[in-house]
Amino acid sequence: MTDESTAEAGRDFIRDIVAADLASGRHKSIVTRFPPEPNGYLHLGHAKSICLNFGIAEDFGGRCHLRFDDTNPAKEEQEFIDAIQRDVRWLGFDWGEHLYYASDYFEQLYAWAQHLIREGKAYVDDQTQEEIRLARGTLTEPGRNSPFRDRPADENLDLFARMRAGEFPNGARVLRAKIDMAAGNINLRDPVLYRILHATHPRTGNVWSIYPSYDFAHGQSDSIEHITHSVCTLEFEDHRPLYDWFLDNLPVPSRPRQYEFARLNVTHTLLSKRVLTELVRGGHVAGWDDPRMPTLAGLQRRGVPAEALREFVKRIGVAKANSTVDVGMLDFAIREALNRSASRRMAVLRPLKVVIENYPEGQSEELEAVNHPDDPSQGTRRIRFGREIYIEQEDFMENPPKKFFRLSPGREVRLRYAYFITCREVVKNPAGDVLELRCTYDPATRGGNAPDGRKVKATMHWVNTADAVPAEVRLYGHLFETEQPDAANFASELNPQSVQILSGCMVEPALARDDAGAAVQFERQGYFYRDRDSAPGRLVFNRTVGLRDTWAKVAAAGS
């Protein structure tokens, strides 16, 4: 490892630990893992863990495993397994040949559970789940021993084998570790190792009738895979003594160590998998990849580039204490990434027709437009200009306030890449609604500059009516209105304006020809991405993130 990579690796306390372990000789190589449970789609919080675990392996020349913690078949589906693999790859990481499943180790875990029984460190408990919960005690009161705690090992082994064989119904018995019912850490009060669950497993089918708990499977899976640094979020800090107890009391092949970091919390966002599942099942969103969802699939469908997520995770860093990050930090990272790469296009979301009265009827011309102002390699495109165009409704005001510089009666403005125009007449319907504008243009200003040097204070985008392409545009906002939504009452805090669907938008023809997977900037509007709902003759765009609205700031300041 070079000095430069060493410096890069020392950005956070976990990388400092890894660097120290290598320097001291505790480990000769580094192995990390990302171990999702396949009971839902990955979200922003997972992105932080993915970047950390794969990033550590990359920084230190090690490897990172992708392991599915598939120990609860009642909630796990192949759909989630497939989606997780897609999302990790999309984020930019590759596990190579190191794809594993906790179910790969079911036989070994069963054998180790038998070992604990023979050692007098595990027993079969016939109490109900509620009886076990009530006997566990509280933070201030010790728990009570189960009446089955002192069962002979032979009887426990027999019952455990019969549990595996499927002789008993769900919930009839569990296997518990025999540790200390008076332990200050409640996780050490004889935790459950196995429960009976008659359910079809996505990989093992109906072979098993018992399944290991997360706590029992996790550390031992780490050991089997020779994980050196088992990195997880802070809610597992109280589980570390149990993680260590299993490793200390089993003949495991290696000794991993668990380290915890702060989980990701973001304003206007809930990352609870329970909440996300209820949002989908309750019909509050249109699926796991709804662009309002904080899932990686949702962010991808919204048009967020993977590099923006990686940069966001890098900026928030790795801390030991939980905190909440403003969602604006994510938006900033998205804008930065898209500003570098997105081609510029013109799109009118709320069209207002403009007739240029002194432009020759039946005539049109091609103008040259720049695809990216800071990236000459993207080249230029040709756009057509004619007598009738569309502009944004909000770019015209009949009686403008002092600091409004866009089009109004008698005012001259610049049309992007085209000409100066001046509004001469406002055409309205009987209700007083503006139907169209009658304007004139200055032929000498072709390209957007006046030969006499006169200046205008506004440049507006437009689309030629003759070749404009209709489109639907979906404007997405925060899914939750409140900055710190309450997971317990999330439904009451949903934002009823989290999506606005605009039909009848008009966009330039290049947008129909662009690659479907390419992000674009609608000039003066924001960054957009073609949605998978698009079809021949039907363009649909999702707003990824908006641009800064300077007029909104001025209006707010003056109100």
Curated annotation (Swiss-Prot):
Monomer. This is Glutamine--tRNA ligase. Transmembrane segments: none annotated. The gene is glnS. The lineage of its organism: Bacteria, Pseudomonadati, Pseudomonadota, Alphaproteobacteria, Hyphomicrobiales. A motif ('KMSKS' region) lies at residues 270-274. Its main location: cytoplasm. It catalyses: tRNA(Gln) + L-glutamine + ATP = L-glutaminyl-tRNA(Gln) + AMP + diphosphate. Keywords: Aminoacyl-tRNA synthetase, ATP-binding, Cytoplasm, Ligase, Nucleotide-binding, Protein biosynthesis. It comes from Nitrobacter winogradskyi (strain ATCC 25391 / DSM 10237 / CIP 104748 / NCIMB 11846 / Nb-255).
